Amino acid sequence: MATSQRKILVTSALPYANGPIHLGHMLEYIQTDIWSRYQKLRGHECHYICADDAHGTPIMLKAQQLGIAPEDMIAQVNKEHQQDFADFNVAFDNYHSTHSEENRLMASDIYLKLRDNGYIKSKSISQLFDPEKSMFLPDRFVKGTCPKCKSPDQYGDNCDSCGATYSPTELINPKSAVSGATPVMKDTEHFFFDLPAFEGMLKEWTRSGALQVEMANKLDEWFEQGLQQWDITRDAPYFGFEIPDAPGKYFYVWLDAPIGYMGSFKNLCAKRPELSFDEFWGKDSTAEVYHFIGKDIVYFHSLFWPAMLHGSGYRQPNSVYAHGYVTVNGAKMSKSKGTFIKARTYLDHLDPEYLRYYYAAKLSSRIDDLDLNLEDFAQRVNSDLVGKLVNLASRTAGFITKRFNGKLAKINDTTLTEAFLAKQDVIADFYESREYGKAMREIMALADIANGFVADAAPWQMVKHDDQQEAAHQVCSNALNLFRILVTYLKPVLPRLAQDVEAFFQLPLTWDALSQDLAGHEIAPFKAMMQRVELDKVNAMVADSKDNLQVTADAPKTAAPEKTAEASSVSSEPLVDDPISETINFDDFAKIDLRIARIIKAEHVADADKLLKLQLDIGGETRQVFAGIKSAYSPEDLEGKLTVMVANLAPRKMRFGMSEGMVLAAGPGGSDLWILEPHEGAQPGMRVK
């Protein structure tokens, strides 16, 4: 038992309930599960909760296209999500849904407290409205001809063909992506959360140690720009919770989504009467609350969420831990390459423990992207887990069973055991601080020592000589005891292997029992515990991921409008989908001033689904450009890169600020979009000719 038991509540971000889990998602759930399992292994009271994020226009429209009720659709997705997580050995204490009575009551409670405390404002805004569906249209649900390059079938906030950004009212011949009708402007009353009122509290909290330094530094940029009131309203029809005392008005999905952490814990408390909700969420709570999230949702979790909690009389989280994205083979996950791998596709081919270990071996406390290099993945798992760890037992256990009645000897020389036990605090600190990669390196260094000990002693030679039987018994017993310590250290990462090893030793693996004397203890006959990664299975997984893409492309188009097939897959013949434009003369071309630019800063734009704000150095001058590339790049990936911009494009006033040019990109759009990157020999300000 740990010296003093902690009370801990830990969460992962809620997956959206309109599609399957993929390996990019799995990074976060594996990272959180390892941390939760470690806390429990140390004897702490730790509750790991999550839920499906089950509200919003995309879910409503997808259910309509499928011809089923949204409730039925999210119930099926919830079942699939839970099965994927269970098969990856992610051990939630509770997995719920934001579309629950607990969450409705919590969202209403928080909203009413914010309203009563003066933090909710109302004002009239103008939005495009679909007269046929009688619904207001978010930007991404309006399509038309780009006002800049005249490409048809573009979204209401940016053009996938030329990268231009604009407002929906600027589209030529705008149409509702829901019904095809021509939208009209209509006024509506919306409620806003007064985020600026919490600026002082948020500045203090974000610098309190609750966030990684990278996150806190990034949030300073939002403070410099000035916090804005946050629109928390959506108009009917909408799949979500109706706002109290406001018929036809619904909570925006990002209001009730983080409240889903509280709703899920409420649900757990109902199942476990010994748990107290207020003990974890009350304003004066001394319990610990931690959120694990992706770096793309830092803004919501580090500004809106703590402010909402503070304004409604609840405690703030102790920490919000962000992680980077997953790349595969050094590039963004790609459906066309077969590297956009669903969790279920992986599970159809490979052991989930392989991925748990590989992610752990590459994870740190920083917000770095993690590359799943499939060749390195196979080599590392085969070397570390099969060649070092399991091999330690497989090469010694048989002698104990066959020659020594399955019983372990009392170890006379405990030098190695003491050296292994001396590392427990170092490894514990690495788990606690989320430095899993460092923990794995420490453990594998110990595995190398243990294997070297066995190789030098060569018990397979000893057993051939009558006078060396006891020495062989000592070596094999010592090796198996070291194996037990190693697997105990790895138990948070490899729970299924740990379970098999517990059956082999016929006793539980606990941190408190690391130094247990197993003299005379009987072990079970050794059984194979882990197979090598076979590259043909890895290749089959990639091939099946490509097949899944083809099935999707051939299937009826049931996806929500913002996820059209054209936007999510790469055409094998770009000129077929996007023919060459009409010929222009040289004088027209010469008017365009293309310059090399270095991206010196990139950041998210609040309430913009596709935009990133870029600060571009063009050689002695800095330009601000809003680029519709958020679906393909995170800000951190762009900073420092060279690109090409249209430098003499007239500045355009947008609701987010002034855009002073355009960066160039290629690709059909969505995640398949690539900015142009000149050779490093080019310098900012150089003209492209």
From Swiss-Prot:
Q: Which cofactor does it need?
A: Zn(2+)
PANTHER family the record matches: METHIONINE--TRNA LIGASE (PTHR45765), METHIONINE--TRNA LIGASE, CYTOPLASMIC (PTHR45765:SF1)
Q: Which organism is it from?
A: Shewanella baltica (strain OS185)
What Pfam families does the record tag this protein with? Anticodon_3, tRNA-synt_1g, tRNA_bind
Which InterPro entries does the UniProt entry name for this protein? aa-tRNA-synth_I_CS, Anticodon_Met, Met-tRNA-synth_bsu_C, Met-tRNA_ligase_1, Met-tRNA_synth, Methionyl/Leucyl_tRNA_Synth, MetRS_core, MetRS_Zn
UniProt-annotated binding residues for ATP: K335
A single BP term in Gene Ontology: methionyl-tRNA aminoacylation
User: What is its subcellular localisation?
Assistant: Cytoplasm
Q: Which GO terms describe its molecular function?
A: ATP binding; metal ion binding; methionine-tRNA ligase activity; tRNA binding
Q: What is this protein called?
A: Methionine--tRNA ligase
Gene name per UniProt: metG
* Chief localization: cytoplasm
List the residue ranges of the region (Disordered).
Answer: 554-574
> What's its catalytic activity?
tRNA(Met) + L-methionine + ATP = L-methionyl-tRNA(Met) + AMP + diphosphate
Question: EC number(s) of the enzyme?
Answer: 6.1.1.10
Positions with a binding annotation for Zn(2+): C146, C149, C159, C162
Per the annotation, the residue ranges of the short sequence motif 'KMSKS' region are: 332-336
Keywords of the record: Aminoacyl-tRNA synthetase, ATP-binding, Cytoplasm, Ligase, Metal-binding, Nucleotide-binding, Protein biosynthesis, RNA-binding, tRNA-binding, Zinc
Residue ranges annotated for the tRNA-binding domain, each copy included: 588-689
Which family does this protein fall into? Belongs to the class-I aminoacyl-tRNA synthetase family. MetG type 1 subfamily.
Quaternary structure and interacting proteins, as annotated: Homodimer.
Task: Give the residue ranges of motif 'HIGH' region.
Answer: 15-25
Q: What's this protein's function?
A: Is required not only for elongation of protein synthesis but also for the initiation of all mRNA translation through initiator tRNA(fMet) aminoacylation.
